[in-house]
Amino acid sequence: MIEGKTFNLTLATSSRKFLEGTTNTYGYNKLSFWGPTLILNQGETVTMNVKNELKEATTVHWHGLHLPAATDGGPHQIVEPGKTWSPSFVVKNNAGTYWYHPHLHEATQKQLALGAGGLIIIRDPIEAKLALPRTYGVDDLPLVLTSRRFKENQITYDGDNDKYGDYQLTNGTLDAQTKLPRQLVRLRILNAEIERGYVLGFSDNRVFYQIATDGGLVDKPVPLKRLTLMVGERTEILVDLGADKVGGTVDLMAYNSNQTFGFPGGEPDTGGANGSFLNNYDYRLLHINVVAPTAKAVTKVPETLTRNVFVSEKEATAKRTISVTDGRPHFAFDGKPFDMHTTNMVVKLGATEVWTVKNNNIFGHSFHLHDVQFRILSRTDREIADYEKGWKDTFYLPKGASVTFVAKFDDFASDTDPFMFHCHMSNHEDGGMMGQFIVSKDPAAVKKDAKGMINFRAQTKHPLPAAEVVATAAQASKPAAVFAKSDLSGNRLVLADLAKTKPVVLFFIEKECPCSRDAAPYLSQLQAAYGRSCSVVGVINADEVGAKEWAAAVKPGFPVIPDPDFAVIDAYGAKRSVYVTVIAPGGTIAKAYPGYNADSLSEISATVAQLGGVPSVKLVWKDAPGELLAGCPLK
């Protein structure tokens, strides 16, 4: 636990023992799984110094906090290896339980699975006046619920294949147990799963009392015997152990049996991509041993907690609908996989809006909105549960259902820094089930392109997985895959002819990716410099119409061949745009590059000159990146 106004968080590799042997993990501040709980006070200005000691990029998102988009820690606020990110912000949220976790696009599941994350507790004057348990770790206990799958003692995180763990981890511990005093105790519970949902209850079916949702206290304690908690959601409950005997025990349970298909973790399989030994099964989350009460025990559940003033639907000036679509191979919103570079949703600063999220798919999702807390207005699958009538930032969206909520977008505006909305199942968000929006003082003044999109290309970087770097390096000396395709002018391009006496440079293009547009001028520069001594050929993941649209916008100085069936792309192992393959005369791959920067462009130039038997041309790569940049996924 860390308190204060300045918080230093260092993310690094670590290890611990879960089963037999040592398991590699990630942790903050030398912890081996999860990070320290941060205690913040409403109204104070805090500084977060996030140092990245991994060998890969990361981000840290302050989940549930209301703060400027530039300090939100989403996919755009990347912390490179060895660097420190130090955002400062005023704590505006109500007292409650929030959390922090990585949000690096396409790498969230990996980093979260390995243990990167932690809790945030915010205190405020209203909560401080209440007679509630708040001695951290004694009668006020945080619980982070998740599960993991292991192979040869190592945590696995391969997308859908590892979305459900076989081993329950509570606070990073197998078969967790604790001692709690014989009195009223407070449990702050976070579902930090990859995908699994939990139906919470106690082994003796006792009543417990919910006192807070995602965004803080509810008006009055809500008596419950069961509570469904989806990925990213938090709840605070009071459990009365006053009638228990010292030495007695009770278990916090996941009552997940008899779920229908579509409930995350409701699949009946015990193995495979959708299977787990914990699926559709009731099991223990925490074994509680009752011990003697503390000297200042809280023994009575308060009758009232606060008086929330919710935003009224009548104040709404706009209504929006978002639909969950696809699922083959990845889920998306409105049929559009996430593009970090653009958004087409602009919200006016201070506006109250009503959003409806429709799930037209066969599977349930966990919807999370950055920036603000909201109030759920309606559901089509059932009545709004008592336990979700408070402030929310995350909710369960079952298959075939719609959820409508109202939110006010106040305080923070930026025409260049977006907020996110996404499925909080990290395998889904990594697969592209995300969108983003801008809060603007003057939406009409925000510049859009011909398609009505707002461009964030300058802020975008993609993680380059180590496996792709290794696979790319392995391409060298392999025979180049043959192809014969027509370019946009109708010319037939046959590799055997192109590479008969001179080198060929293949440049792989994602049709909507600004990375491709940014890199194309450098390849045009290369072609112009060496003229007939080499052939630069663009390969784009589009049909002829899409390829011509791209070429009209970019005006490349080299021919482009459409590859809508990915035949050439797959044959060369290209996973992302701006992938470059250099082919020697005769048809052997000289080298492949998973991304580009000034150094790689200079190396390609020198290689082309050497292979072509011509003098090397000294080129100036104006504004080329200094670090190796990969592009958007080609699929």
Mark where each language-model region is:
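Short active-site neighborhood of thiol/selenol oxidoreductases, capturing the structured segment around
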Residues: 495-517
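Structural microenvironment flanking redox-active thiols in thiol-disulfide oxidoreductases
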Residues: 517-554, 565-570
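Thiol/disulfide oxidoreductase modules built on the thioredoxin-like
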Residues: 552-556, 566-607
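C-terminal substrate/ligand-recognition segments
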Residues: 312, 318-376, 393-418, 422
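Histidine-centered copper-binding motifs that mark active-site loops
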Residues: 1-240, 258-260, 270-308, 315-325, ...
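Short, surface-exposed loop/turn segments at beta-strand-coil junctions that are enriched for proline
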Residues: 90-96, 240-246, 408-416
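N-terminal "domain-start" segment that seeds a small globular fold
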Residues: 464-496
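Thiol-/selenol-based redox modules, centered on thioredoxin-like
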Residues: 585-635
